[in-house]
């Protein structure tokens, strides 16, 4: 408290409430708020309502005690010289009484609840006299209304004409900075209510314009956020409000104003010096936000005022590219055509209130004026002086209160008098504002409090012009205005007004019919004639022109048609009943043909194949990724929307005749432009974040990319073209790549490289403010959050994320080489644009964006370093067979996609790699490693690693802006593709990669790289990405598992196969080098090195002390794994650790060499771990997806086919769509292949879940090849599906709502990420467990699982498809579709969840239980300490992935990891962890160790659910440990159970989706997902270990403890665990449930019966699920009996949720509608059916 000069002063702070005293060093030059935060941080006890504690200066030397105003500087308050050290008290802000007016009794009598309520009523009724009377009696007005949480002052601030009331309250002891229960001060409340009069009064009373709310946001931020009358914004700025406040996502006021199109606020902000170049956590400037949200007016203002349109976000995207990605072509045109010569900076100087005393010392004072945006040409010297530190008060209100008050009143009176004449008579603002510089435009710098200049510029009197208006905007008078002051002009409704300048007090100067003068701004409204009319009128022409620009090559790099090689072919596809056609359709969504669409050489049709499953039906028919559909069954579909095309495909049944056109760019240019050689087909994935956007958007983005980097588009196209050139590899890979995040080698610009480094933690990532990130979950920047939530957001996030992805994980792939942007950008925009912008999935990287973003570029840098890196990979690829290479490329892409998500990538890697692995097993490393080394993969992996680093800062942003994308990425990453591949390469150069670092990175890369199914995976991933923000994630998830499967089965596997093979393959592939050795490395990988002795903490990524419980647990797991070589449980453990840290490291590391070292442990050893990460992501993703959009979800699940177009705007899972029960069909087919277990399921899932049915189709082929692995694969796939499914759907529901719900439960935010993670977790089992499963088959369990698999497969025709779907393909499709929006939404939510989840990953999975928001910060912290990735959704995923990985590890070790690990990754990964994951996630410390955490979380959650929750949690712990050892499969089962149940219940909560999920989980994911519906069937399918594990799981569950609640069920235990999670998740889930369920229901319904029966057989293996409930009275039914009964009434999809929630027979009659919704039965029909069946039971 010394002079301002003193740096820090030691202050003794007494905390009477805690009876403590602390000596703290406080900065006297900082605001009291900062000191208060220091004190709060120093406390070891939490204080209730801590925000309303303040520093109190005790009375001394005759001076009354006073609370220090929070926005004043500490040094403004002279210290008490009576004490050796300055002494302050930290106490609750109560009224400060001058003397003891009343004794305690009297005080208590006065402050009764009745009195306080009466007082609030008086305030509400404006009874100023009564309020004054009570205050005179001594009532303390600083209290919260128990009902509303308001305090008297905040309530009064929201009332009109409350000036006197506010004064009375203030004089009666009300603290101006007293916060409501919501953390808002009266200034915030007045601003949010746009109550200029109250705001003026408060400011006059000495309130600071810069009070922070609970999120650290100022009233100005809220003003920009809320919009409306800009007068409050003007008042705040006039009163020296601080500019540049950032939320958790790095969004500043300017970003929010642009997000919501608040043009006037934006202009005021710019005028007062807002930084137009400010970048949020994703690197997006306000112009990027405008481009994303299509806020043309704001964009025009920004450009007019000199905003730099060339600034790139962390995805290396310019605003123009973002606009293209978002499908906002008109805006893109505006940005593109803007010239610097059009810039007109502000020539005026802002005026400031002179009353407010400027604090010279305040650091803000001077800078603030200097903060003026580039637009202001003349920064007046006085300006700085004029603007006081935000925290400064005009006068110390304590000392100068009276003077201030008098002055205020004086000012107020004078101003108000003038004001009152004005239209907004009550707008004290005029006076206040006016006062400031009546004449001078300069800010009245005078610190003098007096300066009642207000009268000079009475608003009514001569109006003072603030600044000239931006030309080109059209306004119409919406209400009449009659002049009331000099200079005003009359307005009549409907008159066109030309606005000339903006004046003070809400007055504008304009010209109307020749009259020029002033009028109130609220009398006119801007009309977007051009925007709407033009859009409708000339959309066709505009589209043509834009497409010409963007797609045909009017851009720098784009040239004419001659650039393209057009190859048309007719393909006749004949598929079997339960399989899909093996391709994912994507394209513009439109109810009616889009006549405006004009085919171009680049985009000959609206619908194109986003991915083709390698070796699938479509693949064998010669179809390749990126082929455009010209005719379907003889019907021309060039201009037809997605749904209709899907319908046409479905109508054909099992036969499909398609005429397609392959558009490839001429190779020469491509190679010349692109660094990546043919192998880099995945390069497209590295390409821009075009994936999500509609093809048109994508193409355009490509063009824009090209534009920005001539080589980029070429790269993208080249990649796309290259695939066409080499249809096999190139096609699948590059096409997929195109759709996916941009390929690693796509375009590594210097910016990207730097960005990459930034991401890696090099200087670049400065932009990821950890703190910002941290807060993100709860307070995601509203704009970004909403943006994410909105379709656009989905789109943009894709775009944003895409950018992020691009930079961070190679995240956004260009659209398919030939992917045509859907001409109807608006449609995309409206209906599916978000999905269109799969690019956002990369956003997962966004949280890490800063870091990751950088990272991505780094990848690119690597790529750039070159294309060489990519090429290196590519080179190895080159040697590989085309299919494999393709896969690799794809895998790479997927990895890239997944790279952003550490966890994600890791787990998919195993999945992805397995398919390839079988082929390259001998040399999986080599081939994989090349890819892994590939820049793209590396980037991908690195991205995850990056995310770790970025964790804290980026997490938040990610969440908001990129969370979705990141989550999507994460989800996608986890995809089998990512995980699988990462793993495969991992063995190769994973050896060196000792730390968790590698695994994340390696895993991501490895996954993608590692699988022979890179192509399919990539495709799938692309599809996913395309589908939505989550697309990437989903794709990765879906792709990954198939990838993993594929390797298992054969080099060129469909995604499905990969998925199927993932488990087996993963285990196999991961283990490929040597199952045991691989596992060992995995274990070792989990530790730090290949050796099993060192383990890496899943959360922190730090090497574990060998003696630590976690390390011991890991070692035990490793041993178990070693004994069960095939499983990859160790991998899971390592994966999480390695993943988190690894990704960072990997990110930093060079793709090749780094990746090798990093990846080797992760890849091989962490294969399981990786799988968990991906699985988790997947789980997360599904949750997210579910959350993402109920509508999408529903589409995703049941109507994936039609739904897929829904969100993805054309993405469709042909497989799934072709057959409503595609999943069923798939399942059947899969089971048919002989790998009924996982393999069929994954296939199915893939078909259903992802628009990559083709891969699925391939899986069938694959499946036979890899029966055992298939099993694992199947498991994995379902997990994948889950991941995809859940998250998006939930996201779909309102982001905010969901978040709140989830927050309430403590799961929503986590579920999004977590769900993503969990879902991913589910898929991970496939990859992770797959190996386990594969081994399991080798062991007894898999085989057990195997038999069920067929059943499951058949059974899960729907479910399995669903599982499959959940696996990713179907879900992914839908998911991705919904993911775009939901992802975005999720992004925000995810942020919280992510953090929370991260925490869990830490091992504190239960943290999630806490309100997501609170945990979030905590989570961040843990995450923070862990790899950065935790922070982001990715982080979250990572954490999930860790959990998953750990769980995976555990399950792999003890239980066929295939099912368990992945499952745990599920939303309930944490919960899952409870079981398998606990070991896995905390597995390092020890299964038990992990379990307690998991258990605690589980128990809290389960307790909430009140169902064996605790036992579930605990049992899993115990059981896990034992299961891990006894039945490796069992542990997996346990983990899987945990995961699967989570997936299952998640799905259950989703309702129909749940069915799919559930089905998928048990069958596809190992029985977890479908366990609830047909656990046995599903389990038998043992897509994941569960089926065999089911028994094992059951025993394990039971062994673990029926308490797990899943005892009966393999996931029974986990389900309860999940249940808690589910409960948490449910809030977000229900929304998605509603939609998804509907969709699922449709599909689920018919399939359900089949799957249900299937479970029956499966039940045998599962024992628990198929209980003879008919022989028992309802009251004696166990939860499994309830599940069997549900299946008997064809509502098996809800089984998982019911079991997760431990719903037993006795509970059924008492279930309410709300209970059913929580249980996922969101469809009225389903609920009625259940209730009807219950009545029948009662009757019988």
Swiss-Prot record:
Modified residues (Phosphotyrosine): 122, 555, 931
SAM domain location: 1677-1740
Biased composition (Basic and acidic residues): 404-415, 1017-1027, 1175-1195, 1361-1371
Domain SH3: 470-529
Keywords: Actin-binding, ANK repeat, Cell projection, Coiled coil, Cytoplasm, Methylation, Phosphoprotein, Repeat, SH3 domain, SH3-binding, Synapse
Record's keyword annotation contains DNA repair: no
Phosphoserine modification, residue list: 373, 375, 387, 394, 482, 694, 781, 790, 801, 891, 898, 1135, 1160, 1164, 1167, 1254, 1421, 1511, 1522, 1530, 1549, 1644, 1646, 1648
GO CC term, one of those recorded: ciliary membrane
Motif (SH3-binding): 1411-1417
GO biological process: adult behavior; AMPA glutamate receptor clustering; associative learning; brain morphogenesis; dendritic spine morphogenesis; embryonic epithelial tube formation; exploration behavior; gene expression
Family per record: Belongs to the SHANK family.
Protein name: SH3 and multiple ankyrin repeat domains protein 3
């Amino acid at each position: 408290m010394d002079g301002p000069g003193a740096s820090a002063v030691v202050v003794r702070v007494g905390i009477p409430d805690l009876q403590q005293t602390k000596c703290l060093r406080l900065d006297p030059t900082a605001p009291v708020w900062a000191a208060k935060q220091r004190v709060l941080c120093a406390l070891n006890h939490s204080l209730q309502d801590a925000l309303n504690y303040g520093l109190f200066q005790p009375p001394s030397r005759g001076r009354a005690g006073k609370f220090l105003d929070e926005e004043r500087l500490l040094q403004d308050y002279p210290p008490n010289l009576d004490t050796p050290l300055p002494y302050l008290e930290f106490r609750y802000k109560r009224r400060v009484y001058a003397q003891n007016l009343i004794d305690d009794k009297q005080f208590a009598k006065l402050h009764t609840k009745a009195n306080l309520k009466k007082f609030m009523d008086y305030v509400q009724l404006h009874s100023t006299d009564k309020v004054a009377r009570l205050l005179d009696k001594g009532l303390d007005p600083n209290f919260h209304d128990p009902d509303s949480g308001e305090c008297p002052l905040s309530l009064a601030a929201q009332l009109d004409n409350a000036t006197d009331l506010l004064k009375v309250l203030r004089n009666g002891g009300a603290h101006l900075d007293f916060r409501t229960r919501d953390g808002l001060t009266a200034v915030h409340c007045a601003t949010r209510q746009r109550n200029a009069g109250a705001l003026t009064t408060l400011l006059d009373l000495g309130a600071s314009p810069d009070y922070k709310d609970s999120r650290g946001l100022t009233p100005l931020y809220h003003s920009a956020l809320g919009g409306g009358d800009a007068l409050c914004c003007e008042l705040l700025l006039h009163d020296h409000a601080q500019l540049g406040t950032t939320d958790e996502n790095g969004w500043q006021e300017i970003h929010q104003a642009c997000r919501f199109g608040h043009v006037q606020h934006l202009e005021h902000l710019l005028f007062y010096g807002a930084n137009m170049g400010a970048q949020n956590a994703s690197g997006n400037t306000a112009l990027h936000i405008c481009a994303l949200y299509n806020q043309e007016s704001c964009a025009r203002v920004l450009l007019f005022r000199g905003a730099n349109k060339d600034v790139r976000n962390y995805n290396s995207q310019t605003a123009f590219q973002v606009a293209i990605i978002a499908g906002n072509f008109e805006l893109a045109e505006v940005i593109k055509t803007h010239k610097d010569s059009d810039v007109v900076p502000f020539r005026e100087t802002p005026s400031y209130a002179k009353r407010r005393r400027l604090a010279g010392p305040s650091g803000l004072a001077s800078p603030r004026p200097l903060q003026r945006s580039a637009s202001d040409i003349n920064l007046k010297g006085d300006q700085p002086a004029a603007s006081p530190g935000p925290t400064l008060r005009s006068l110390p209100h304590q000392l100068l209160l009276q003077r201030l008050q008098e002055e205020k009143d004086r000012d107020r009176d004078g101003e108000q008098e003038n004001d009152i004449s004005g239209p907004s008579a009550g707008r004290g603002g005029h006076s206040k504002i006016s006062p400031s510089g009546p004449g001078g435009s300069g800010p009245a710098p005078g610190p003098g409090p007096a300066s009642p200049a207000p009268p000079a510029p009475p608003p009514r009197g001569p109006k003072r012009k603030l600044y000239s208006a931006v030309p080109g905007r059209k306004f119409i008078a919406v209400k009449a205005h009659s002049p009331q002051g000099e200079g005003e002009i009359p307005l009549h409704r409907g008159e066109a007004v030309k606005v000339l300048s903006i004046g003070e007090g809400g007055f504008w100067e304009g010209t109307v019919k020749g009259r020029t003068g002033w009028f109130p701004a609220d009398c006119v409204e801007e009309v977007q004639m051009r925007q709407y009319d033009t859009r409708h009128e000339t959309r066709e022409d505009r589209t043509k022109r834009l497409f010409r620009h963007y797609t045909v090559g009017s851009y720098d790099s784009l040239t004419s048609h001659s650039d393209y090689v057009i190859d048309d072919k007719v393909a006749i596809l004949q598929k079997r009943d339960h399989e899909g056609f093996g391709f994912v359709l994507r394209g513009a969504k439109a109810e009616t043909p889009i006549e405006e669409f004009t085919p171009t050489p680049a985009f000959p049709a609206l619908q194109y194949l986003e991915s083709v499953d390698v070796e699938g039906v479509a693949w064998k028919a010669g179809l390749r990724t990126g082929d455009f559909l010209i005719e379907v069954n003889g019907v021309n579909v060039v201009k037809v929307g997605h749904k209709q095309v899907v319908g046409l495909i479905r109508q054909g049944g099992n036969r499909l005749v398609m005429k397609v056109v392959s558009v490839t760019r001429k190779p020469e240019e491509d190679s010349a432009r692109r660094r990546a050689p043919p192998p880099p087909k995945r390069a497209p994935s590295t390409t821009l974040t075009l994936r999500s956007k509609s093809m048109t958007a994508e193409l355009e983005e490509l063009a824009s990319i090209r534009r920005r980097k001539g080589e980029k588009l070429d790269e993208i196209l080249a990649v796309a073209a290259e695939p066409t050139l080499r249809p096999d590899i190139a096609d699948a890979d590059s096409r997929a790549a195109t759709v996916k995040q941009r390929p690693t080698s796509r375009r590594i610009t210097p910016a990207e490289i730097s960005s990459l480094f930034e991401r890696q933690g090099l200087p670049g990532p400065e932009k990821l403010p950890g703190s910002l990130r941290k807060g993100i979950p709860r307070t995601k920047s509203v704009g970004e959050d909403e943006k994410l939530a909105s379709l656009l957001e989905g789109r943009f996030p894709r775009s944003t994320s895409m950018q992020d992805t691009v930079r961070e994980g190679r995240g956004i792939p260009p659209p398919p080489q030939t992917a045509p942007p859907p001409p109807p950008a608006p449609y995309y925009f409206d209906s599916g644009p978000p999905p269109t912008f799969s690019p956002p999935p990369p956003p997962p990287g966004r949280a890490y964006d800063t870091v990751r973003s950088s990272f991505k570029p780094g990848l690119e840098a690597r790529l750039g370093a070159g294309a060489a890196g990519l090429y290196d990979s590519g080179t190895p690829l080159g040697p590989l067979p085309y299919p494999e290479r393709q896969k690799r490329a794809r895998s790479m892409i997927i990895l890239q996609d997944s790279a952003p998500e550490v966890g994600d990538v890791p787990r998919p890697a195993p999945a992805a790699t397995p398919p390839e692995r079988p082929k390259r097993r001998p040399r999986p490393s080599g081939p994989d490693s090349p890819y892994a080394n590939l820049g793209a993969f590396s980037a991908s992996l690195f991205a995850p690693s990056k995310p770790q680093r970025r964790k804290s800062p980026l997490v938040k942003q990610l969440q908001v802006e990129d969370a979705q994308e990141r989550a999507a990425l994460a989800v996608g990453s986890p995809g089998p593709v990512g995980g699988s591949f990462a793993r495969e390469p991992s063995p190769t150069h994973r050896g060196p990669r000792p730390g968790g670092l590698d695994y994340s990175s390696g895993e991501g890369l490895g996954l993608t790289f590692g699988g022979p199914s890179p192509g399919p995976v990539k495709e799938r991933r692309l599809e996913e990405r395309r589908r939505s923000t989550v697309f990437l994630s989903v794709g990765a998830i879906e792709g990954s598992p198939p990838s993993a499967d594929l390797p298992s089965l054969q080099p060129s596997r469909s995604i499905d196969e990969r998925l199927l093979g993932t488990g087996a393959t993963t285990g196999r592939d991961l283990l490929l080098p040597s199952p045991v050795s691989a596992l060992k490395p995995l274990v070792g990988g989990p530790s730090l090195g290949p050796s099993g002795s060192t383990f890496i903490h899943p959360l922190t990524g730090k090497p574990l002390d060998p003696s630590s419980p976690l390390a011991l647990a890991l070692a035990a797991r490793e041993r178990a794994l070693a004994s069960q070589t095939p499983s990859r449980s160790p991998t899971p453990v390592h994966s999480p650790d390695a993943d988190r840290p690894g990704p960072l490291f990997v990110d930093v590391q060079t793709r090749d060499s780094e990746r090798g070292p990093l990846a080797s442990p992760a890849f091989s050893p962490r294969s399981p771990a990786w799988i968990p990460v991906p699985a988790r992501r997947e789980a997360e993703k599904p949750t997210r997806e579910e959350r993402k959009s109920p509508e999408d979800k529903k589409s995703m699940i049941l109507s994936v086919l039609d739904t897929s177009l829904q969100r993805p705007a054309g993405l469709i899972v042909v497989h799934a769509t072709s057959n409503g029960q595609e999943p069923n069909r798939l399942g059947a087919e899969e089971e048919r292949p002989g790998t009924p277990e996982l393999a069929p399921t994954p296939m199915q899932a893939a078909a259903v879940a992802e628009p990559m049915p083709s891969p699925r189709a391939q899986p069938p082929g694959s499946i036979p090849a890899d029966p055992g692995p298939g099993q694992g694969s199947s498991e994995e796939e379902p997990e994948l599906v889950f991941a995809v499914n859940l998250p998006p759907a939930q996201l779909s529901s309102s982001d905010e709502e969901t978040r709140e719900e989830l927050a309430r439960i403590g799961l929503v935010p986590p579920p999004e990420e977590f769900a993503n993670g969990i879902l991913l977790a589910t898929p991970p089992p496939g990859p992770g467990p797959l190996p386990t499963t594969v081994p399991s088959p080798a062991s007894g369990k898999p085989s057990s699982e195997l038999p069920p698999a067929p059943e499951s497969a058949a059974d899960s025709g729907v479910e399995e498809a669903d599982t499959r779907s959940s696996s990713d393909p179907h879900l992914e499709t839908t998911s991705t579709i919904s993911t775009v929006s939901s992802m975005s939404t999720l992004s925000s939510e995810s942020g919280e969840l992510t953090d929370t989840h991260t925490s869990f990953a830490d091992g504190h999975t239960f943290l999630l239980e806490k309100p997501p928001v609170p945990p979030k910060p905590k989570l961040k912290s843990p995450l923070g300490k862990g790899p950065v990735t935790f922070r982001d959704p990715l982080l979250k995923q990572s954490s999930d992935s860790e959990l998953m990985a750990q769980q995976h590890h555990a399950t792999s070790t003890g239980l066929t990891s295939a099912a368990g690990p992945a499952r745990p990754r599920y939303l309930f990964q944490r919960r899952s962890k409870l079981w398998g994951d606990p070991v896995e996630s905390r597995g390092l410390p020890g299964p038990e160790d992990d379990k307690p955490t998991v258990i605690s979380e589980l128990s809290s959650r389960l307790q909430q659910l009140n169902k064996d929750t605790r036992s579930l949690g605990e049992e899993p712990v115990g059981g896990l440990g034992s299961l891990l050892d006894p039945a490796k499969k069992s542990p997996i089962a346990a983990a899987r159970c945990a995961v699967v149940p989570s997936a299952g219940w998640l799905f259950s909560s989703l309702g129909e989706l749940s069915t799919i999920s559930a089905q998928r989980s048990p069958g596809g994911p190992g029985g977890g997902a479908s366990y609830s519906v047909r656990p046995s069937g599903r389990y038998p399918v043992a897509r994941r270990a569960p089926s065999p594990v089911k028994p094992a799981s059951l025993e394990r569950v039971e062994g673990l403890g029926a308490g797990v609640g899943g005892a009966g069920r393999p996931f029974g235990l986990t389900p309860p665990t999940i249940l808690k999670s589910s409960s948490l998740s449910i809030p977000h889930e229900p929304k998605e449930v509603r939609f998804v369920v509907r969709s699922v229901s449709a599909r689920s319904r018919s399939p359900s019966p089949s799957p249900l029966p299937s479970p029956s057989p499966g039940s045998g293996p599962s024992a628990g699920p198929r209980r003879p409930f008919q022989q028992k009275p309802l009251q004696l039914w166990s939860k499994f009996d309830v599940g069997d009964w549900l299946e008997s009434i064809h509502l098996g999809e809800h089984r998982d949720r019911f079991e997760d929630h431990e719903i037993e027979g006795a509970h059924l009659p008492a279930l309410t509608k709300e209970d059913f919704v929580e249980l996922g039965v969101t469809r009225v029909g389903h609920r009625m059916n259940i209730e009807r069946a219950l009545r029948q039971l009662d009757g019988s």
